[in-house]
């Protein structure tokens, strides 16, 4: 009952925080944590995902929820008094791109996730008044598809141009703790909030049973990490771009950022080269390094109407490879398809799951595979990507047949048998759930 009755109270408090932040641009908010009462913590619990992996204490969401009232009543005074000790995060490694590298993910304890969510709920209404419209990552009411839509519209308005495709090396592991604290205190000086953020930055990680204290970085996977990343890059990149870079450019330009993944687009090559030269120096001042091989300037000008094949490059952004292609009316339009690395990684993940689940009943496999396919199509199902979606659907069917054939020495499944199985347990077809939002592209 506390959680349900407190939702309206929490949203009202957040609206007040937002209004104060809007009335005091550039000034520090010194009183936020008094809002973090039991209703606030119950709402933070409600918003916290319950299906995630467990942290170093091994406690699941269900186990924490079994005594939720007492747990939250004990958490509030510890969080506000400074007695709360942030536990180290459990480190896991997941493959990146084509699998040649891995990305470290930090898994906090469930209680830590709840408290981090509560602090995010305090910071969000403040920083939403400051963040620019071209920033899309981990913000309320914004998504990766919104960022892709903004990029498409900008490219068509500029008729292409020069794309600075930027890759920050190990961004989440490279955040300078002291600089992050300084940037945070420019807008928030509430002692409880600043202290809790400091505890999370200093908590360290448990990697393979070995405790490691990190002097920089914030673990990916933490609830607070995306907010801290946005605060950092808002000052390091966004404000710099708006106040110092764009006023000095000769031509038109725009920036689209999703967390640490961003592209800059310029109508003039000279502008692009100038920014490319100074960007690395700017980032180095804040402890960040650009990947020398993955950061590149891509010619992406729209070909002439009467021209043949475009003599331009391509670039990847948010899992899609962007190129120029012909629309249904024969005009040039930006085309997007699933990036090769993402395609390969998604298939590898399904292959690994099928291997581990090959002895489950076929009906259970079909249900799980259907959910995985729907998730893939939900993200990659955009206009112009139907070929990649159909191919992915076909490859998944092939993988399923392969692992069904390996259930035993006598379990070989022919394609006739597989087709009968698919008729009984059909997988969801390749769909374009984002088609309606992008029909304007098809009519160019």
Tell me the role of every PLM-derived stretch.
Residues 1-444:
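Non-catalytic terminal/accessory segments
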């Amino acid at each position: 009952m506390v959680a349900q009755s407190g939702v309206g109270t929490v949203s009202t408090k957040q609206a007040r925080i937002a209004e104060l932040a809007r009335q005091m641009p550039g000034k520090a908010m010194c009183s936020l944590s008094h809002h973090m009462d039991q209703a606030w913590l119950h709402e933070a619990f409600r918003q916290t995902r319950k299906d995630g992996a467990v942290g170093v204490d091994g406690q699941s969401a269900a186990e924490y929820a079994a005594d939720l009232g007492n747990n939250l009543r004990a958490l509030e005074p510890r969080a506000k008094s400074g007695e709360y000790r942030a536990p180290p995060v459990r480190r896991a490694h997941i493959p990146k791109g084509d699998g040649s590298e891995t990305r470290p993910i930090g898994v906090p304890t469930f209680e830590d996730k709840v408290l981090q969510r509560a602090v995010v709920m305090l910071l969000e209404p403040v920083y939403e008044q400051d963040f620019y419209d071209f920033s899309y990552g981990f913000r309320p009411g914004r998504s990766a598809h919104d960022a892709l839509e903004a990029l498409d519209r900008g490219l068509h308005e500029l008729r292409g141009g020069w794309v600075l495709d930027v890759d920050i090396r190990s961004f989440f592991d490279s955040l300078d703790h002291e600089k992050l604290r300084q940037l945070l205190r420019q807008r928030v000086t509430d002692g409880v909030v600043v202290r809790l953020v400091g505890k999370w930055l200093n908590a360290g990680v448990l990697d393979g049973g070995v405790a490691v204290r990190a002097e920089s970085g914030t673990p990916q996977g933490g609830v607070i990490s995306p907010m801290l990343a946005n605060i950092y890059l808002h000052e390091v990149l966004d404000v710099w771009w708006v106040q110092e870079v764009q006023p000095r450019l000769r031509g038109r330009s725009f920036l689209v950022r999703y967390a640490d993944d961003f592209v800059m687009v310029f109508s003039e090559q000279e502008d692009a080269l100038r920014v490319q030269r100074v960007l690395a120096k700017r980032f180095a001042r804040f402890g960040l390094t650009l990947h020398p091989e993955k950061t590149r300037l891509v010619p992406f000008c729209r070909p002439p109407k009467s021209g043949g094949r475009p003599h331009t490059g391509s670039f990847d952004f948010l899992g899609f490879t962007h190129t120029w292609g012909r629309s249904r009316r024969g005009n040039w339009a930006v085309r997007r398809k699933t990036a090769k690395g993402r395609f390969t990684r998604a298939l590898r993940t399904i292959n690994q799951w099928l291997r581990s689940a090959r002895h489950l009943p076929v009906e259970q496999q079909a249900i799980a595979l259907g959910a995985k396919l729907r998730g893939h199509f939900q993200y990659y199902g955009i206009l112009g990507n139907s070929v990649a979606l159909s191919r992915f659907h076909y490859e998944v069917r092939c993988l399923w047949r392969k692992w069904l054939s390996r259930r035993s020495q006598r379990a070989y499944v022919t394609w006739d048998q597989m087709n009968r199985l698919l008729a009984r347990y059909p997988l969801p077809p390749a769909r374009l759930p984002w088609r309606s939002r992008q029909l304007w592209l098809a009519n160019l």
